[in-house]
UniProtKB/Swiss-Prot annotation:
Cell compartment(s), UniProt: Cell inner membrane
Domain of life, per lineage: Bacteria
High-level lineage: Bacteria, Pseudomonadati, Pseudomonadota, Gammaproteobacteria, Alteromonadales
Organism: Shewanella frigidimarina (strain NCIMB 400)
HAMAP family noted in UniProt: MraY
Sorted UniProt keywords: Cell cycle, Cell division, Cell inner membrane, Cell membrane, Cell shape, Cell wall biogenesis/degradation, Magnesium, Membrane, Metal-binding, Peptidoglycan synthesis, Transferase, Transmembrane, Transmembrane helix
Protein name: Phospho-N-acetylmuramoyl-pentapeptide-transferase
CDD domains listed in its UniProt record: GT_MraY (cd06852)
Cofactor(s) annotated in UniProt: Mg(2+)
InterPro entries registered for this protein in UniProt: Glycosyl_transferase_4, PNAcMuramoyl-5peptid_Trfase, PNAcMuramoyl-5peptid_Trfase_CS
Entry membrane topology: Multi-pass membrane protein
Length: 360
């Protein structure tokens, strides 16, 4: 909103023109979301404690997790509020890429909220029934996928960018909808599965969001996009604001979510953040790069698929427990060691993903 005010005030004082620069607003967006999260975090935690909205811990999980029972959850509300306020202040709300991303954050946030509400308030350990959760995710994802396909006006908006190959950019056509659907739903559930230890999911999310901020800026800049053989997407530049807001809100939340956690994000946070990363990857045409940079999320998801598949087909489990972070806990790794090592893996994969922009 302040973009429009600054644009109006520029006619009276040229200094307000600084707000027309995406980089300047991105910094302000990050700081706004960060300060908001740090300021309101203690207030939200106290309120959640008063309402007795505490984490439900499964009885068959690692014994070290029993102490987490009752820790305030649904802290993802803090993250989403920080992102929304920051983007509403510093983003260009006439940009359809920004609006689509906000819609995804809101819709998947609502799905996660319903799931959390049933678990911690209604005391239903299963939360939202799996088929209903998947159905709601599918509806939201398909709405976005169909809209993006039908509203595309440039060839680059529906091309598939293949890392390491500068000349391979096949036109997806109607398959774009299918790819977008699986990217959004898959990323949403992958981050949700990863969110099992203190700070484990939020830091990789912050790293990937920061990387996408850079990619969005490069894709929105004609010269940089041409130099790096990326599709030039003029609207992508404004996604930098969304990405840096995610970084700021995520770091602010990590202040309270780091081991030992004072609050958990819950499904309201993990489902929304994962879906947001998915739709941003779609908008900047880097779905494959998301698989690389979000490798920790992929690893967690694959471990669950392998575990379930192996048990159903062979009656044997591959891991001591899935997702895989629990496997290492049961092997005797202290929780902080698992968390930090997964962070290091995530950092490596994000840097590897960024390197592919030049290695073509």
């Amino acid at each position: 909103m302040l973009v429009y005010l600054a644009e109006y005030l520029t006619q009276f004082y040229s200094g307000f023109n600084v707000f027309s620069y995406v980089t300047f607003r991105a910094i302000l967006g990050l700081l706004t979301a960060l300060v908001f999260s740090l300021w309101w975090g203690p207030i939200l935690i106290k309120h959640l404690q008063t309402l007795q909205i505490g984490q439900v811990v499964r009885d068959d999980g690692p014994e070290s997790h029993f102490s987490k029972r009752g820790t305030p959850t649904m802290g993802g509300i803090l993250i989403l509020a920080g992102i929304f306020i920051s983007v509403l202040l510093w983003g260009d709300l006439s940009n359809r890429y920004v609006l689509v991303t906000l819609f995804v954050l809101a819709s998947f946030g609502v799905i996660g909220f319903i799931d959390d509400y049933r678990k911690v308030v209604k005391k239903d350990s299963k939360g939202l029934i799996a088929r209903w959760k998947y159905a709601l995710q599918s509806i939201a994802a398909l709405v976005v996928a169909v809209y993006l396909y039908s509203s595309s006006t440039m060839v680059g908006e529906t091309q598939l960018v293949v890392p390491f190959f500068k000349d391979i950019m096949p036109q997806l056509g109607f398959m774009f909808i299918l790819l977008a659907y699986f990217t959004i739903v898959g990323a949403s559930n992958a981050v949700n599965l990863t969110d099992g230890l203190d700070g484990l999911a939020i830091m990789p999310t912050v790293m990937v969001a920061a990387a996408f901020a850079l990619i969005a800026y490069l894709s929105g800049h004609a010269q940089f996009a041409s130099y790096l053989h990326l599709p030039h997407l003029p609207l992508a530049g404004e996604l930098v604001i969304v990405c840096t807001a995610m970084v700021g809100a995520g770091l602010g939340f990590l202040w309270f979510n780091t081991y030992p956690a004072q609050v958990f994000m819950g499904d309201v946070g993990s489902l929304a953040l994962g879906a947001a990363l998915g739709v941003i990857a779609i908008l900047v045409r880097q779905e494959i790069l998301l698989v690389i940079m979000g490798g920790v999320f992929v690893m967690e998801t694959v471990s669950v698929i392998l575990q379930v598949g192996s048990y159903k087909l062979r009656g044997q489990r591959i891991f001591r427990m899935a997702p895989i972070h629990h496997h290492y806990e049961l092997k005797g790794w202290p929780e902080p060691r698992v968390i930090v090592r997964f962070w290091i893996i995530s950092l490596f994969l994000v840097l590897l993903g960024l390197a592919t922009l030049k290695l073509r």
